[in-house]
């Protein structure tokens, strides 16, 4: 089908504001030598560590220093000009007649998912019980340095470009909802394309049209249907529902969730070392699936291998939880699934029953 005259570009305002602000900001670190009080600036921590190895015969150690991050932002006008150019650029690239910008609100349903608290590094001599990390969804980003102008950039998008703020979901969910609704309307005869414009890899699993501004050579993609996974060197690429299934098994370290967290911590507690389960392993589980039933059975079987019996764990809220493989799978489906409509949620147990993977509960 040829592109109709009426085309709307839907833009992730979170992503674009962050990108524009980062491009207009220099960063460095200040290392303060605690015993002497002397300070020295470095471009980054790697440069600082190289300095420790090569200067003064390596007599300095990292624990003798306090590190603080410093930011050197350009004027806010530079950020706003960049955003204006980015919007105009993507509209031209997809031949859009209009655009809509979406920004995440203060709340997010995924923050309520009772992910395990024990998202930790292994026990070691310095930390016999392991080192506790954040367990809440996306909490690993909590201490990351945010661009100085980020808040003002989002306010600009709202005031000058009519950006809408989401409720109880992230901007990428709202993009998915908008794109899915547009694709369904299109299949029913609507003479309009709705094109989510984002570099977010999760968008590859949404049934909609899609444009990645970072990869213009891919053009306007159509992620309809079951999709596929493809080996590309060391990486696995994919689209359609197969890409969602891939994420459900792999997890996402950027968003701070891993379906093997509970298993890995139990293995460490028992004195063992968990075996790695990366992209290639996930691909091997899903590569022969021919339809959705195959994929759901493969995912369920893998979760049952990880959690053959009901397990107990401590959530990030310090609650003791007891869950079986399906309940655990539900958590990670909730993390990975982008909403197709408001309050959209895949019920794992019902889906497995519908697919005939497990017997219907009475």
Predicted features by range, described:
Residues 2-191, 197, 208-221:
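Noncatalytic, basic helical substrate-engagement surface that gates or grips nucleic-acid strands
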Residues 96, 123-361:
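Extended two-metal-dependent nuclease catalytic cores across DNA- and RNA-processing enzymes
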């Amino acid at each position: 089908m040829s592109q109709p005259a009426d085309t709307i570009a839907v833009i992730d305002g979170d992503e674009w504001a962050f990108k524009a602000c980062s491009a207009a900001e220099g960063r460095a670190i200040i290392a303060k030598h605690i015993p002497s009080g002397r300070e020295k600036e470095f471009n980054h921590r790697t440069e600082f560590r190289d300095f420790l190895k090569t200067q003064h015969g390596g007599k300095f150690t990292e624990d003798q220093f306090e590190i603080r991050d410093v930011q050197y932002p350009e004027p806010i006008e530079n950020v706003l000009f960049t955003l204006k150019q980015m919007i105009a650029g993507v509209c031209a690239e997809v031949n859009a007649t209009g655009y809509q910008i979406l920004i995440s609100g203060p709340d997010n349903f995924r923050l309520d998912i009772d992910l395990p608290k024990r998202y930790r590094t292994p026990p070691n001599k310095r930390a016999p019980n392991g080192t506790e990390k954040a367990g809440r969804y996306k909490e690993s980003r909590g201490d990351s340095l945010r661009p100085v102008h980020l808040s003002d950039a989002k306010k600009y998008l709202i005031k000058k470009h009519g950006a809408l703020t989401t409720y109880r979901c992230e901007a990428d969910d709202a993009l998915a909802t908008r794109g899915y609704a547009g694709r369904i309307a299109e299949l029913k005869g609507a003479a309009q394309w709705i094109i989510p414009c984002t570099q977010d890899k999760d968008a590859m699993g949404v049934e909609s049209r899609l444009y990645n501004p970072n990869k213009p050579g891919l053009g306007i993609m159509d992620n309809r249907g079951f999709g596929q996974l493809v080996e590309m060197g060391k990486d696995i690429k994919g689209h359609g529902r197969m890409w969602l299934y891939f994420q459900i098994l792999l997890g996402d370290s950027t968003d701070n969730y891993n379906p093997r967290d509970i298993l890995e911590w139990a293995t460490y507690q028992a004195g063992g070392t968990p075996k790695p389960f990366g992209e290639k392993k996930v691909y091997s589980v899903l590569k022969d699936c021919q339809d959705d039933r195959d994929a759901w059975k493969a995912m369920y079987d893998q979760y049952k291998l990880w959690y053959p019996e009901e397990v107990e764990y401590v959530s990030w809220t310090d609650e003791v939880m007891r869950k079986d493989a399906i309940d655990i799978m539900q958590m990670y489906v909730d993390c990975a699934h982008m909403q197709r409509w408001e309050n959209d949620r895949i019920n794992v147990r019902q889906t497995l029953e519908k697919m005939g993977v497990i017997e219907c509960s009475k």
